[in-house]
């Protein structure tokens, strides 16, 4: 059951501090050192649950730092949907194994050109997560 939107709340706060300082030439050829520190907090709450995500990072560089990517609600939603989607399993041989499995499997076409055949025996398979029962379904039928 979804609650009305006026009972749910989302907050997103972000702060960034960048400083530039003079340093000895042994530390930085440019004579300057750039430091950046950022903090982010996103919170989503409803009467029945609360989710909080906090991140912090810092970087140091002898060159000016590029602007960081600011966390956004859309990035959070996309990350959440990606994690909920069904996993895709891929079984494939590494390039080294493929190369080894194809050695000695050369043949010629009708023009005398060498053909290389590979038959690694590996396949790609996609699976779905088992479907969850909702409350209206009963386990007694199983």
UniProtKB/Swiss-Prot annotation:
Any matching Pfam family: Luteo_Vpg
Basic and acidic residues bias (residue ranges): 125-142
Amino acid composition bias (Low complexity), ranges on this chain: 50-62
Example GO BP: transport of virus in host, cell to cell
Residue stretches of biased makeup (Polar residues): 9-22, 33-43, 74-95, 113-124
Cysteine-cysteine disulfides: none
Statement: the UniProt record of this protein carries the keyword Lipid biosynthesis: no
Keywords from the named record: Transport, Viral movement protein
Keyword Transport annotated: yes
InterPro entries: Luteo_VPG (IPR001964)
Chain spans, region Disordered: 1-142
Record's function text: Transports viral genome to neighboring plant cells directly through plasmosdesmata, without any budding. The movement protein allows efficient cell to cell propagation, by bypassing the host cell wall barrier.
Family: Belongs to the luteoviruses movement protein family.
Protein name stated in the entry: Movement protein
Organism: Bean leafroll virus
């Amino acid at each position: 059951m979804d609650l009305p939107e006026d009972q749910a709340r989302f907050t997103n706060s972000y702060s960034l501090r960048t400083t530039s300082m003079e340093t000895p030439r042994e530390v930085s050829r440019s004579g300057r050192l750039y430091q950046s520190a950022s903090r982010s907090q996103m919170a989503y709450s409803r009467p029945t649950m609360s989710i909080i995500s906090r991140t912090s990072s810092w970087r140091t560089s002898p060159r000016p730092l590029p602007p960081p990517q600011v966390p956004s609600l859309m990035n959070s939603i996309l990350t959440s949907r990606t994690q909920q989607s069904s996993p895709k399993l891929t079984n494939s041989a590494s390039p080294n194994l493929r190369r080894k499995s194809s050695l000695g499997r050369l043949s010629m076409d009708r023009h005398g050109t060498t053909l290389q055949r590979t038959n690694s025996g590996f396949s790609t398979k996609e699976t779905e997560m088992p479907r969850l029962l909702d409350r209206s379904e009963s386990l007694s039928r199983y």
